[in-house]
Amino acid sequence: MAKFVFVTGGVVSSIGKGIVAASLGRLLKSRGYSVSILKLDPYLNVDPGTMSPFQHGEVFVTEDGAETDLDLGHYERFTDTAMSRLNSVTTGSIYQSVINKERRGDYNGGTVQVIPHITKEIRERIHRVSANSNADIIITEIGGTVGDIESLPFLEAIREFKGDVGRNDIAYIHVTLLPFINTSGEIKTKPTQHSVKELRSIGIQPDVLVCRSDRNINKELKTKISGFCGVHAEAVIPALDADSIYSVPLSLKKEGLCREILKILELEDHQCDLEEWEALIHQLRNPGPSVTVAVVGKYVRLNDAYLSVVEALRHACIAQNASLNITWVSAEKIETEGPENLLEGIDAIVVPGGFGNRGVNGKITAIQWAREKRIPFLGLCLGMQCAVIEWARNIAGLKEATSSELDPNASHPVIHLLPEQQDVIDLGGTMRLGVYPCRLTPETMGHKLYGEEVVYERHRHRYEFNNSYRNLFVESGYSISGTSPDGRLVELIELKSHPFFTACQYHPEFLSRPGKPHPLFQGLIEAAQLRLPATPQEVFKNTLPNFQKNK
């Protein structure tokens, strides 16, 4: 039977519950336990798919096509375990399910209420993850902050969960803040005390406190927190600010988080194997020369909008012994200021995904700059579509070329709507989503990077390359290096005349892992290193890991 761990947060939002949950998952996995992690988000949206990146950050896409919270990306990267749509639960999806059941008459005329119907639905979602994953331990992160009205049904549900399983099958972790007051020179415990008091008033006594702080927490302070909060002193776990999120598992291991959780759950504390993770952190802290990568996007005011892209670049730099320096470039600024003022001195350019007209011409201009200046370039989703438009306009002679997303009446729609999207009206959850196969063309850079005939990548798009123009592109020098197995959909393109110019319709960033960088990102960084002084190496001379088999 599975064991269950619940992670709540107090005092402030964005306190790091997701990283704590992901780090615990890594620590448990390093001891031989299988884990699955889910997120309970207390907003009324059914999923974050239609939410603004400025409000929510990136939308992370799972293998089975769910549009989810970016924390699921952390879960996957830390545990190297694929999550599913079951691992993402929102208040909106809970209410939608309960209301649908009521409309079908499933409640036999009963009065449908938050308690017991909503809380029961929440508990059933957690049990469903357990049944589907067969994991030894299910970790559940509850979004929001204890004390928020919108989180109450979730907190009540995890309180009730004690009745579903044995007391030794469940553990509660509360992540809280210990602020330092400069004027008094003291770390204050009162916010933590009040947060635990609030949690207790709901009926939940935390078993472990993970205390965020920017400085060391001494034994005396831990004893004080233990006394006021009813938690064993050994279960007061300091979580100091870290130089990298990937060093957090090592810090929490040192402080004994995993040991305490296993003790509460009455599980054996096996030998911990973090040798590869420790080597990764050593490499991260001792990088080689810096590589400057420009990320040209629409949402650059909020870096979390491109979180997986940043992490994929970081993974590639770790593997290539490089220090990552990201230059955030607004696509709209390129339209007004020109690429020569914003992209000079850049070692590589990434144009990530997005939607709508705003900033598209700036992206196209940046791609032209990368092509003409022979700067390593990687386009993702909309980035590939912009690369296609740039080539059509400037090389293939189609000056009016564009996407039908940008101009429904375009004379040359080199990018057009997927046929199956023609009659779609709703925006949420209706795109081409999830994992699809891509057949790679032999003797192309893409094939060489992957080292596979067929790869599987995650998608999130409505528009595609228009095959009416395929012959024109190939004849003018474009190389189509990856398609759907039936050859109908163009998935990966490249320019053989360029040091590194490739773009894909999918989102490779979702599959990159700290110890297994995605081949396209690693290839980009390796190509960028050739532009650095005193870096005598050939592009792709290193044998890239067999990415898909190790996935």
Swiss-Prot record:
Residues binding L-glutamine: G354, L382, G383, M384, Q385, E405, R462
Pathway annotation from the record: Pyrimidine metabolism; CTP biosynthesis via de novo pathway; CTP from UDP: step 2/2
Transmembrane segments: none
One of the Pfam families matching this protein, by short name: GATase
Activity regulation (UniProt): Allosterically activated by GTP, when glutamine is the substrate; GTP has no effect on the reaction when ammonia is the substrate. The allosteric effector GTP functions by stabilizing the protein conformation that binds the tetrahedral intermediate(s) formed during glutamine hydrolysis. Inhibited by the product CTP, via allosteric rather than competitive inhibition.
Residue span, Glutamine amidotransferase type-1 domain: 292-534
Reaction(s) catalysed (UniProt annotation): UTP + L-glutamine + ATP + H2O = CTP + L-glutamate + ADP + phosphate + 2 H(+); L-glutamine + H2O = L-glutamate + NH4(+); UTP + NH4(+) + ATP = CTP + ADP + phosphate + 2 H(+)
Binding site for UTP: S13, K188, T189, K190, P191, T192, Q193, K224
Molecular function, one GO term: identical protein binding
Residues that coordinate or bind Mg(2+): D71, E141
Keyword Ligase carried by entry: yes
Residues where CTP binds: S13, D148, I149, E150, K188, T189, K190, P191, T192, Q193, K224
Region span, Amidoligase domain: 1-267
Active site (record annotation): C381 (nucleophile), H507, E509
Family the UniProt entry places it in: Belongs to the CTP synthase family.
Subunit structure: Homotetramer.
Function statement: Catalyzes the ATP-dependent amination of UTP to CTP with either L-glutamine or ammonia as the source of nitrogen. Regulates intracellular CTP levels through interactions with the four ribonucleotide triphosphates.
Additional comment: CTPSs have evolved a hybrid strategy for distinguishing between UTP and CTP. The overlapping regions of the product feedback inhibitory and substrate sites recognize a common feature in both compounds, the triphosphate moiety. To differentiate isosteric substrate and product pyrimidine rings, an additional pocket far from the expected kinase/ligase catalytic site, specifically recognizes the cytosine and ribose portions of the product inhibitor.
Protein name (database record): CTP synthase
